[in-house]
């Protein structure tokens, strides 16, 4: 009994704990196959558990199809169906309608019109609005055309045909108003010149008189100068000579 009780702890500790050195190699080999079998059984169970979801997954669409058929069967199909059509009521604010290829915003109809231009399905055929020119622009165009016609009429025929342009210088005849203006200008110029000459003469005379008053000997020379500047009428007349007044005359 003592031997059996002494060997039991060693055998019981072997599977749970580390086998002691007292165990024989035959006993250890007998324990290893049991462990390998236990390890091999776990992957089989795991693979079997993984196989169940794969089988359950395809069953779900089948169940959903059955539910859809039941829902369709429960709906009454005797209700008459009518076609529902929607017509555009108006362009909402902040939205622009779609345009067909090759069209522009000018082709859009007015807001009050019935048809609206879209992708080409709802747009109706309408006459395009003609732009009216401003009357001022029309008058300017007419003036330009008249001016071009007049200028073309004044150009010589040789120049219009592409030949060498003939240069002609036309003397403009002076109008009577221009002549009067020129005469008035010339008259005023002459008057101004005369006044200037008179002013110069007066200044010269004043300066001479002042100088004569200061210098007594200059008076004789001042009297001689105008006599020399006079035109010579009779050189033989002794009365015209200076300093011979009253010589040869009888009183």
Curated annotation (Swiss-Prot):
InterPro entries: MDFI/MDFIC. The keyword Nucleus applies. GO terms for biological process: dorsal/ventral axis specification; embryonic skeletal system morphogenesis; maintenance of protein location in cell; negative regulation of DNA binding; negative regulation of transcription by RNA polymerase II; negative regulation of Wnt signaling pathway; regulation of gene expression; regulation of JNK cascade. It is found in: Nucleus; Cytoplasm. Its main location: nucleus. In the embryo, highly expressed in the sclerotome. Also expressed in the notochord, neural tube, limb buds, heart, branchial arches and head mesenchyme. In the adult, highly expressed in skeletal muscle. Expressed at lower levels in most other tissues. The keyword Acyltransferase does not apply. Keywords: Cytoplasm, Developmental protein, Differentiation, Nucleus. Residues 1-64, 84-167, 230-251 are annotated as: Disordered. One of its GO terms (molecular function) is identical protein binding. GO terms for cellular component: cytoplasm; nucleus. Residues 84-94 have a biased composition (Polar residues). Belongs to the MDFI family. Inhibits the transactivation activity of the Myod family of myogenic factors and represses myogenesis. Acts by associating with Myod family members and retaining them in the cytoplasm by masking their nuclear localization signals. Can also interfere with the DNA-binding activity of Myod family members. Plays an important role in trophoblast and chondrogenic differentiation. Regulates the transcriptional activity of TCF7L1/TCF3 by interacting directly with Tcf7l1/Tcf3 and preventing it from binding DNA. Binds to the axin complex, resulting in an increase in the level of free beta-catenin. This is MyoD family inhibitor. It comes from Mus musculus.
């Amino acid at each position: 009994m003592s031997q059996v009780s002494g060997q039991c702890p060693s055998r019981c500790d072997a599977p749970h704990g580390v086998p002691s050195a007292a165990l024989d190699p035959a006993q250890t080999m007998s324990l290893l196959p049991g462990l390998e079998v236990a390890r091999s059984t776990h992957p089989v169970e795991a693979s079997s558990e993984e196989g169940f979801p794969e089988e359950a997954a395809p069953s779900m669409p089948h169940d959903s199809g059955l539910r859809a058929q039941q829902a369709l069967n429960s709906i009454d199909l005797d209700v008459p169906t009518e076609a529902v059509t929607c017509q555009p009521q108006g362009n909402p604010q902040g939205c622009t309608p779609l345009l067909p290829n090759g069209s522009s915003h000018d082709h859009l109809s007015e807001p009050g019109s019935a048809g609206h231009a879209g992708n080409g399905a709802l747009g109706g055929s309408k006459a395009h609005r003609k732009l009216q020119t401003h009357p001022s622009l029309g008058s300017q165009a007419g003036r330009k055309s008249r001016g071009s016609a007049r200028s073309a009429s004044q150009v010589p025929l040789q120049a219009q045909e592409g030949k060498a342009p003939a240069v002609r210088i036309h003397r403009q005849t002076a109008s009577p108003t221009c002549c009067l203006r020129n005469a008035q200008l010339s008259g005023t110029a002459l008057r101004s010149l005369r006044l200037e000459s008179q002013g110069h003469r007066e200044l010269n005379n004043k300066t001479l008189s002042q100088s004569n008053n200061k210098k007594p000997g200059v008076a004789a020379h001042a009297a001689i100068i105008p006599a020399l500047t006079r035109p010579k009428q009779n050189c033989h007349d002794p009365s015209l000579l200076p300093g011979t007044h009253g010589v040869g005359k009888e009183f």
